[in-house]
Amino acid sequence: MAKKRVVVLYGGRADEHSISCISTAGVLGAMDTERFEPIPVGITKDGKWIINGEDPRGWNLDGGELPTVKITPESRPVMLDPSRGQDGFFIGEPSHINSADSGFGTSFVSMSDPEMHHVLTSLGHVDAVLPVLHGPYGEDGTVQGLLEMMGVPYVGCGVFASAACMDKHYTKVVLDAAGIPTAPGVTVDARNFTAADVLAEIEDAGLTYPLFVKPSRAGSSFGVTKVEKADDRETQQDRLAAAIATAGEHDWKVLVEQGIDGREIECAVLCPKAGDEPEASWPGEIVLDHQNDDQFYDFDSKYMDASASHVEVPANLPVSVLEDVRDVARRAFKAVDGVGLSRVDTFVTPDGTVMVNEINTMPGFTPISMYPKAWDATGVSYTELITRLIEGVLR
């Protein structure tokens, strides 16, 4: 049987660019190459699609340096002709990548132009796309919309679920409407606010400290600040203003959420084929072995300091509570019309209440990430997980 050809998209324009690269290294290393022919296509930080660049299989964080998609002498641009669907992927010459007057300033071409046949080579038929892209311009419905328009099967949530879950404000709107508890909070426009007005809104909402201030549309703990209670209003306003400014560097829409007294428990959800009932893994917990001064699980703790934490699956909770987390995760996934995969992050309070923190439609996918580790502990190996996700979208 012929191998199915799978374009693996990685990198991208988001802050999470390097995390996407690391996830892709794991995915390519675990993919069943007896069934699939992976075709890695990198996206540079400025949005150029390239092939034949640096091999992502060798990337890791052992050296402490974050990998990025770079244009090398061997790199060639990838162009798309949306009208040709699964046969609409083409490769240009290296000189086309940065040539301003070559006509290749965009990734879109029309092969109805006879001239294009002299300068572009077909990538061949693509059976599916696996977008291992985190954050905006990849996990937010934009790439999903492009692939929908082309009629190319792809792994993961569709346009609506991707967009709704990328924007934490609208995740709350959807989940609240579905009767699923979320952390109390307010939304602030970082382009136009006064700290006094924000503080008044926080007080009107009855939020208690500490507060977590975060970008609405960012991940991997970028731009997140923990704000403690101050002794006076002026200091409190200064702290809030600084935290909103930090979050505003990543997104003008900023959430100010009440810190929840509870444990952060994560659950992996799998639904390879649209319309099937979603499955939920045993929930897991990231246990902090030591913390930085901010006392929360920040970017460095997640990715740069291997000694900062370890993953426990299943989490050390009563089975009844674990089952409640699984149930809430499935309900949340269905509420946003999820398909493919998601990691549902929850808080479990001391009285056993399960609240959804956020839904990641393309969670970290490295071998040590929670999503594959949770499924491995539930009986689905890393390789089997990737196989099921791809085969679920094949025609």
From Swiss-Prot:
Its EC number is 6.3.2.4. Binds 2 magnesium or manganese ions per subunit. Mg(2+) 2 binds at residues 358, 360. It is found in: Cytoplasm. Pfam families: Dala_Dala_lig_C (PF07478), Dala_Dala_lig_N (PF01820). The keyword Transcription does not apply. Mg(2+) 1 binds at residues 345, 358. InterPro entries: ATP-grasp, ATP_grasp_subdomain_1, D-Ala_lig_Van_CS, D_ala_D_ala, Dala_Dala_lig_C, Dala_Dala_lig_N, PreATP-grasp_dom_sf. Residues 172-391 form the ATP-grasp domain. Its cofactor is Mg(2+); Mn(2+). One of its GO terms (molecular function) is D-alanine-D-alanine ligase activity. Pathway: Cell wall biogenesis; peptidoglycan biosynthesis. ATP binds at residues 204-266. It catalyses: 2 D-alanine + ATP = D-alanyl-D-alanine + ADP + phosphate + H(+). GO terms for cellular component: cytosol. Keywords: ATP-binding, Cell shape, Cell wall biogenesis/degradation, Cytoplasm, Ligase, Magnesium, Manganese, Metal-binding, Nucleotide-binding, Peptidoglycan synthesis. GO terms for biological process: cell wall organization; peptidoglycan biosynthetic process; regulation of cell shape. Belongs to the D-alanine--D-alanine ligase family. Cell wall formation. This is D-alanine--D-alanine ligase. It comes from Bifidobacterium longum (strain DJO10A).
